[in-house]
Structure formats: structure tokens, C-alpha cells
Amino acid sequence: MDKLFLFDAYALIYRSYYAFIKNPRINSKGLNTSAVMGFCNTLHEVLTKEKPTYLGVAFDPHGPTFRTEAYAEYKAQREETPEDIRRAVPIIKSLLKAMRIPVLEADGYEADDVIGTLALKAGAEGVMTYMLTPDKDYGQLVRENVMMYRPRHGGGYETLDAEKVCAKYGIANTSQVIDLLGLMGDSADNIPGCPGVGEKTAVKLINEFGSVEQLLEQTDKLKGALKKKVEENAEQIKFSKFLATIKTDVPVELNLDELKVSEPDADELRKIFTELEFKTLADKFLNKAENNKKSVQIQLDLFAENPTDGQVFSKNASLRALNELPHTYKLIDNEEEMKKICDFFMTKKILSLDTETTSTSAIDAELVGLSFSVKEFEAFYVPVPTNREEAQKIVNIFKPLYENPEIVKVGQNIKYDMEVLASYGVCVAGQLFDTMIAHYLIQPELRHNMDYMAETCLGYQTIHIEELIGPKGKKQKSMRDLPPEQIVDYAAEDADVTLQLKNYLEPKLEEVGVTQLFYEIEMPLVRVLAEMELNGVRIDTAALAETSEILTKRLSDIEKRIYELAGEEFNIASPKQVGEILFGKLKIVEKPKKTKTGQYVTSEEVLQQLSGKHEIVGKILEHRGLKKLLGTYVDALPKLINPRTGHIHTSFNQTATATGRLSSSDPNLQNIPVRGEDGKEIRKAFIPEEGCLFFSADYSQIELRVMAHLSGDENMIEAFRSGHDIHAATAAKIYKEDIADVTRDQRTKAKRANFGIIYGITVFGLAERLDISRQEASQLIDGYFITFPKVHEYMEKAKQTAREQGYVETFFRRRRYLPDINSHNGTVRGFAERNAINAPIQGSAADIIKVAMVRIYKRFKDENLRSKMILQVHDELNFSVVPEEKETVERIVLEEMQGAYKLNVPLVADCGWGANWLEAH
């Protein structure tokens, strides 16, 4: 049977845009591509999974519709369309044109009406029709051959036929959806309905009377307040039904030939995807062979009506490839030539280097080849044999070059190359220049991989590794499987392009004002992190095994208790089944929250609020916590121990966060739980080297101290300088108590206010977090700003600075760009404003600990200490310490942490010693 898909464009565009609201997709020209990307992903998913015969996309028209003419308040409550969505719409229409997919519009009618009319016509002709939309009002159109295709919360789609729509809303037939909406209204469209009548009552009334009209004719059968509400609002109910009714007689023709899915205009589609920097989507939509054509003209003025301020990078007019450019790449495969080029490189001041290896994990990688470049478009590739002894001989030829401190070493993610070379006895020396980190400091929100940077900075399309070893998967080859002749262009290009990127990015660092941050903090930190990753950290597997046994037994006991309380067994890991037990069977609350698809919400946040309602809620939360602890850490960590070293080797990432904080992966040690007895057991398993001590030092309330410095608030500065507990001091001032009389509850509230306000917490957010009324939360925030007036001034000034220049900065001039700071949409603007307040605080704190790490590392080297820095977790540094160096290490660490930056308040670090991380922390 033929299939027709009709897309509700704006509903999907809005959904896509807000899905990325916390982490918007911004390309190198500053264009927010979230809405376009999300829409394209949906389109591709439908085309590949559902393989429709016909497809059309309906848009709301410009100007009024019959509903707004009849009711000026229709949708009037909605905030102004975000600028980024307005910019996205013409781009999406251009994409659809290139895809040869019709855009469906009718003056005076909404997309709903156009879809409704075409869906019914197509269904009547025997075409199975799917209306792709998240909007519930489409349920009224569902009938034979006409179904809803609705995005699920969290991914995927659900198909709703007439039976499912009726079951969902508890009605007899789908036409009654409009009767429900007429009674209960629809806040999304500002349809008023009948005041005081919710979904439950509306369903009951429609099941009893059949329709709004029948109900209004028989109001004498109603009683009390409900009778009065319905009679007093009869006209409003009828009018609400009119507004909710989707028109099915719009003057549009069903032309299946025009709607037939066909091959796209590949050249035009490629132009648009290239301009958007959608490489993955281009690969998805276009034939791979076509997509790899090496000359792609970019229509630079495609989006010229929306220029972006503060643009750092511009795109060249075409993407060039290696075979179009004069270049000299040489394969060096004999010892005599190797020595000659090494001597040649030793006369240069700058060397771009790269390694080809067998693994993306540096600790396990073996060398396949070495690449070098000292001049743009010239590069050399040296293959390295499999035999370790032979490989070492070749590395030794270049060892003096790598270890020459007078030569600047340039690399893309150079930390990886340094670690690989370290396993061959090479200690890379000299000033470093990492192109990935340089690009990150200039535009932190963008991608920083070489392929992307080559395209956006150099207008150059690199050879992709998949062209050599195939796509990811079981059949992907290793670089070791290829002869050197096949690798040379790819490997030499890496070193060459890295050098070109260095020459392009270096002046940009100066333009943005981050040269000092780059050379004095981020580049020295590369060495620190490389050594920490190579050192790794020891894990007490016996302790973890014991913890696993204890927690698994507890988990089993909790499960039994949950089943007892529920009166039946069910899948505790299933949110759906948990919701049905808590709210369907036990009815622990009268009006539980539901998702748009009608499923009960059982998130941790919701269950925390309900934990006092029934014992089962606390048990489910406890079960979830233990399950996560076991799966993520207790049972997982032993499997991550490297069998050769006996250590866990995490990767520290310098370019993963917008704020400048370090993150870690494989495994993520930043999220190891701190609170709770069970979480502490994890830290207990982290131990120092054999015969060593574990030393931990962490900053005390560094973000609040940074806030005190930035705001210059005298009261906050005085509280820190006097050495008081800052939260007790805050509570004393807010509640006008002597600090000795502050209660634990008052201190807790002040602590939440202290940290919450840094993150731009609202009255509603603080009320929820503290489980207090909004009035009390409002009084607490007001009291806070009366106590610390300059904190409020700082917050307002930070937002104003961001509005004027488009970004905010840390102490060290690290920038956070905020393209949405002047948005007319309150939700979007609110995110940007909170980031304007928080980014300088969190970013400065991140920079301070980086400074401390660099200085501590240098002091350890200068004093020839054998003790090692092994972990960094947010504001905390951890060390494996040789016992006789104990006093020296503590002195150095505290001196450098507390002296990393001169604040108006003391920078304090607390420290501790032990046999493991828990004891030391």
C-alpha cells in the first residue's frame, strides 16, 4: 500500500530547536543550526525507515488565519518566535526544494488545516496517510487510512490509529477529541475551554453526553458548581470547540504526482549542507561517492540576510583537495634518508608532527608511522615496522629531534602523540602548539577535529581515515594492514594541514586575546595531563569485589521489599511500570505528572519530591542509586584496568566543556559520587602506588570566593577574610542572627542560596530544591541580595556586558560566547543570561586550578620528586606520595594552590592524607 507522510513543519522545527537549547548547534559562522539539524534528522529517519511513496511539508502562512481573525487571543500567549527559528525556516525551505519535497501552504489557514484536508483526501483514495506531529489536536483526524505519527519523548515514534487515540483519551471515537479540547481548553494554543474543567472531567462529560452540543442541551442533568460553570461558559465552550476544529475543506488540491518522493538535486543539496557544515548529514542524504567530489562550490550568500556579529572564522569560497593543489609528500623508508631529513629538521625552528598508530588508546597504541612537516604543502612520512626492536631503532633516529627544546612542536591533539612516543622512550621537549586547543580557545562552542577545522579555516577537504581503513565496525581494518604507499598521502597531509592550521590560528589567538592563556596555561598543562594519563591510578579490586557483594545483597533485599509494598513483582528498571505501580495502582498522589505521550513521569527529581508520600518511593530511589553505582563503578572499574600496567588510565579532555573545566573519559572519573556511604566506598578503592601515601587537596568554596572577588561585595569579602563558615555567615546576615545561633536548617538554606544564585536559580527553582513555599524562597533571595547587594550588581553587569559584546570572560580572558543573549524569546534569553553570570565564575575557578597544576608539576620536576599527581576532579587534586616526600609535597601543593591567583579574599585549599582516596579526602 502506498504511504503518504505529511509533516507539521513548525511543530517539528520548534521541537528540534528546544531539544538542543542547553547545548545549541552553532557553526563556524555563528549560525544556530539546531532547528535545521533536528528537522533534517527527522526527515532522514522517515525516508530511510518508513520509505514513504509520497511526502509533503506543511507550513503556517505569513499573516492572519481564520482563527486569529475570529479570536485575536488565539496563540497570543506564545513568546515571540526565536530569531534562530526565523532564520532556520528559509533554510529548511531551501533544503526541501533541493530534496524536491513540496512545501504546502494556504493563505488564511494553519498547517493543521492543510494537513487535515490533504490527509482525508488521500485516505479516501486508499493511500495510507501519516501525519507527523507532536500536537494532540490531530487526533480528531485519525480514521481509516489516516494515522498520527508522533515523536516519542526520549526518541523514536509511535503510530496512533483510531483505536489508540480513543484509548489514549478515554473516548468512543476520534471526532470527540475536539469536544474534549472545547471543554478542557488547550494552553498551547490559548484556547480557553471551560474554566475549572480539566481532562478528567471533560472525558467524563463527553462519555456521558457524546458531544459539546449534546452537553449544552442537557445541562439540567448536571449538578452544583459544574452545572454553573458549564452554563455560564456555554458560548466560550462552543467557541473553543470551533478554534480546536481542524478544517478539512481548505482550497488545496491533492496532487500525488507532485508529492511523490524522488531523487534530490544533489548539487544544490550539497551546496546547502556544505554551507551549514553538516558533513554527517551530507553523507547520510547524498551518495558517498558523490559526496567525496573534491571541488564543491559554496554559495556564500545563501544566508546573507542574517549576518552574524562577532564572527571569528570565515569560509573560503571552495573546498579544495590534495589532488588539486601542488604539494610534495615523500615516503622515507630507508635509514640513510631518515637521518638526512632528521638533520634537516634539526635546523628548523618549528616542526609539525603526527603519529599513525594501531589504537586510539595511547597507552595501548603501537607506532605504524611518523609524519613531519616544516613547510606548508611539504611533508614526509616514515613507516615504522611491526617488530618492536626494529621500530625502536627508527624512533631513536628521530629522538634527538623530538627532544630538542629549541624547536617548537606543533600537533593536533599533541598529548596523544606525546604519550605514544613516551612508550618508545621519547620525551617530547620544546614549546608546544596544539591546534585543537588553539581552536577551542578561539571558538569553544564549535567542533575541533582536524577535518572540520580544515574545511572551515582553510577551505580544504582532508582525506578521511575511513577512505583507507573503511567505516567503523568489525570489518574496519587497522593502519597496520595497509602498505606505506597507501598511507603516505593521508599521514603526510595530517602533519601538513596541522602546520597550516597553526599558521592560521596563531594570529587569531592574539585577536581574541587568549595568547597568554594558551601559552602559559593550556600548553604547559598538556605535559601535566600526558604524564597523569600515563601514570594512571591504582584500583583495589579486592575492596571493590567486597563492596559489590555487599551492595548486590542489599539490592536484592530492596527489590523484595519493593515487591512487598507494591503487592506484585514488576520491572523496577522500567519507568512505565514504576509509574503504573506508583500512580495507577497505589495512587500516591492525586494528580501525577505525565509526559506528552501520557506516560507517568518517574524521574529522580519527581520521585525525590514524593519520597515522603510512601515508603516504596524511597526504596525505588535507593534501588536506582545502587544499580547505577554497581553498573557504572563497582563492577565496571575492574574491567577498565589495563592488564599491562595494572592501572586505570583515564583521558583528560581540555576541549570538551564550554567553561574551560577539564573533563575525563574512558572512564569518566569526574562523576565519581562524593556523598552517601555507598559512594564513599568507590573512593576507598582508589589507592596510591605500592608503599606510597594518598594525598588529596581541594579548594574550599572556590566559586564563591571568585564571586566575592568579581562582585567586590564588602559583606561577602569580610565573611571570607574573617575565616567564618561562609554559609553560616550568610545565614546570620539574612536571618539577622548571631552566627553562633544559626540553625542547621538556616545554614542549609543559605548554602543552597549561595550556590544556587551563582547558577542563576529562580524563585521556583529554589522553592523546589529546599521544599519551601515560593514566598519563602522569594524572601530568601531578596534577603540574600540585601545582604550582598554587589552580588546583584555583578549579575546585572555581567548580563549587560554580554549583551553589548556578545561574550563574557574569565580572569584569564577565556571567552564564553552567548549568541542568544539578546533573544526576544524569554526561555532562550534566560539560558544565555544564566551563562553570562556563571561562566566567568566557573571558568575562572577552572583556570585557577590549571595554573596550580602547572606550577605543582614544575616544582616536582625542579626538586626531582618521585611523588606523582594522579587525578584531578573539579576543584580537587590527588597524589601518590613517596613517604619521605610527605612534608615537601604538602608544602608545595598548598603553596601553589593557594597562590595560583591573587583574589580579594583568601584562596584556601583543604588537604588530607590516607591509605586511599576516601581516607585522604
Where are these regions (language model features)?
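Noncatalytic, basic helical substrate-engagement surface that gates or grips nucleic-acid strands
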Residues: D2-L132, K136-E163, Q236-F239, T245-E253, ...
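Conserved RNase H-like, two-metal-ion catalytic cores of nucleic-acid enzymes
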Residues: K3-F5, R15-Y54, A72-E73, Q77-D84, ...
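Short alpha-helix plus adjacent loop in nuclease-associated cores
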Residues: E73-R87, R143-A172, K227-K229, F380-P400, ...
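Helix-hairpin-helix
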Residues: G185-E208, F273-E277, D540
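Conserved "right-hand" nucleotidyltransferase catalytic core of DNA-directed polymerases
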Residues: N233-T386, Q412, E445, M453, ...
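Conserved catalytic core of nucleic-acid polymerases
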Residues: K477-R480, L534, N642-T645, H649-T650, ...
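Active-site palm subdomain of RNA-directed nucleic acid polymerases
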Residues: L509-I521, L525, I848, A852-V873, ...
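C-terminal polymerase-core module
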Residues: K553, D557-K560, E564-G618, I786-N838, ...
